[in-house]
């Protein structure tokens, strides 16, 4: 089974939850999601003590972007500020740190500035608690150009985040199926001084929303990840 279990916390911060009028429940959401994942990780570790399981809290990009305007008529407009996003992430990460999470994973990164807000929040939590938590960064690229939605190449992304001392791994998630992801993983493995992660989709959805890759197809492609320098493998959309 899995070595790392993901807590269901992807959108559990008040920026995303405000759309559903549930922002006042984010502390409870994170605490409960982490508890469920922690209990399962500990149960599996007891069954196989030679293979400890770890819990990662997934932290999504929110439904806002700091680098781009949501208003085509006003390109200078931003839906939120860097400080507002930092505060929302810090609130979420503080609960997770206090609950004993093993790893933070900032994933589906499409805007590097959003990711930098997450890194800043993690640093503040570390300063407040004295607890250092390793960070996984997982980028999603927009198309075959290999750039994020905000226009950065993977090289540029790495240059933007390498100042942070707590980064444990960088990688890719979503974007493509496993085979199509491989060229971009090679770019990361050649340039990044970290472990490399990959969480591909099960292909791309068809017109009915069904993902086209079977487990056997994904497994065959993922075997090649070893040659691409990948250390951590999971799945994204359509893979469960």
Predicted regions and their residues:
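Domain-level signal for soluble alpha/beta catalytic cores
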Residues: 1-240
